Amino acid sequence: MRMLPLKDKAQVGLWSARYIADRINQFAPTAERPFVLGLPTGGTPLTTYEQLIKLYQQGEVSFANVVTFNMDEYVGLSADHPQSYHRFMFDNFFNHIDIPRENINILDGTASDLLAECAAYEAKITTLGGIKLFFGGVGSDGHIAFNEPASSLRSRTRIKTLTQETLIDNARFFNNDINQVPKLALTVGVGTLMDAEEILILATGHNKALAVQAAIEGSVNHLWTVSALQLHPRGLIVCDEAATMELKVKTLRYFQQLEAPELAKY
């Protein structure tokens, strides 16, 4: 597993956007052979989305032959709800690039049969040949997507009850009122993520430092679902200085030495 320790959130956003754009361009997608990209929501990826939009506007990347699958969605929120992940993605990314509407896939938290919705999502990913690159963030408790602590590391797309810590973290999007935060969500599973050809996880801020430590220095542990990346042949964590604060000095220096050519660009 790689870890790229950058200076700040701005560098993390710029580097990750260029990385995603490079992967798309190297793949040279067509309508018959699209690049399948997994996407997150939340505060961490916003800078990446801003930079991807700039790259698109500059003609450096096109999303015309990209198919996306979002990681998760709240149960019970309509697509036009201000805090739905549908709304987040269109407001912050999709409305600003050239991706066709039919190429966008987001779980429907208002589906009449939620289990069928999850099964259909998995089936569509499989039909398209799997996800090439899954881009995501990590929670302060180490969760990826809504795979909360103690999630099965072989889990698939399913309904998930959110932990108190996640509800508190997300209350900032609901007028700081934890009672407004939905208690259930639909989420891709850890197994779904691990099936991707490549996983790119971003971690920024002091509140992500314990999660980064668990992912890099800890053992594979279902209480820190991000630690499953240790088992992936192409797992990459990109973080800022604040998110490395719990790492041992020798661990941080090791990755700084490994990634010296990349770090020298910034």
Curated annotation (Swiss-Prot):
Pathway assigned to this chain's UniProt record: Amino-sugar metabolism; N-acetylneuraminate degradation; D-fructose 6-phosphate from N-acetylneuraminate: step 5/5
Top-rank taxon, per record: Bacteria
UniProt cross-references to Pfam families, sorted A to Z: Glucosamine_iso
GO molecular function: glucosamine-6-phosphate deaminase activity; identical protein binding
Annotated active site: D72, D141, H143, E148
Gene Ontology process terms (BP): carbohydrate metabolic process; glucosamine catabolic process; N-acetylglucosamine catabolic process; N-acetylneuraminate catabolic process
InterPro entries attached to this UniProt entry: Glc/Gal-6P_isomerase, Glucosamine6P_isomerase, Glucosamine6P_isomerase_CS, NagB/RpiA_transferase-like
Site location (Part of the allosteric site): S151, R158, K160, T161, Y254
Regulation: Allosterically activated by N-acetylglucosamine 6-phosphate (GlcNAc6P).
PROSITE patterns the UniProt entry points to: GLC_GALNAC_ISOMERASE
Record field: catalytic activity: alpha-D-glucosamine 6-phosphate + H2O = beta-D-fructose 6-phosphate + NH4(+)
Family under the similarity heading: Belongs to the glucosamine/galactosamine-6-phosphate isomerase family. NagB subfamily.
Job description of the protein: Catalyzes the reversible isomerization-deamination of glucosamine 6-phosphate (GlcN6P) to form fructose 6-phosphate (Fru6P) and ammonium ion.
Annotated protein name in UniProt: Glucosamine-6-phosphate deaminase
